[in-house]
A protein has these predicted regions:
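A generic structural micro-feature
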Residues: 5, 73, 94-98
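Non-heme Fe(II)/2-oxoglutarate
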Residues: 1-72, 80, 89
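Catalytic core of non-heme Fe(II) oxygenases with the double-stranded beta-helix
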Residues: 81-148
Length: 153
């Protein structure tokens, strides 16, 4: 009998990106090692309308709550916008001190890659060629898509 253990749930959903048009555009600055343009340091959270917080809460809740993964005191921390040009990239990273994160693809298709948290052990014991032990996950998401994932990915 085969049994799967240590599964990592992620969620794909659709959002109405036109709702985000009401968010004031914060200045974009080069960030992180990649220099991708971002409002990470300049986006004032208080400028994000309550309607957006409510909309995003609803999308997250309909995914996490039905899977019994949403805590009783859930709250959003920080929202920002990254703008990618053709050859821009984002280094592998996590979102510390948070449980769940998400990416919304407003006008680009996904080039996001998630690395298996056990990648080092898998490579050490099995190499890189067993499809039963994938080393990464590259979702195929279009504009208007949202992916919700544990922040340790």
């Amino acid at each position: 009998m085969k049994q799967e253990i240590f599964g990592i749930p992620i969620f794909h959903d659709q959002v109405d990106v036109t709702k985000f048009d009401c968010i004031p555009l914060a200045p974009l600055e080069p960030t992180w090692d990649s220099g991708v343009m971002s409002s990470f340091s300049s986006q004032k959270q208080e400028e994000i309308p309550e309607s957006i917080w409510g909309y995003l809460s609803g999308v997250v809740e309909r995914n996490l709550y039905s899977a019994q993964l949403m805590g009783k005191n859930a709250r959003f921390g920080h929202i920002w916008r990254n703008v990618y040009k053709k050859h821009d990239y984002q280094d592998a990273h996590i979102h510390p001190k948070s449980q769940w994160s998400y990416v919304i693809y407003v006008d680009v298709t996904s080039r996001t890659a998630f690395f298996n948290p056990s990648i080092h052990n898998i490579q050490n014991h099995f190499g890189c060629t067993l499809p039963q032990f994938p080393l990464d996950y590259k979702p195929n998401l279009e504009p208007g898509s949202m992916i919700i994932f544990p922040s340790f990915l």
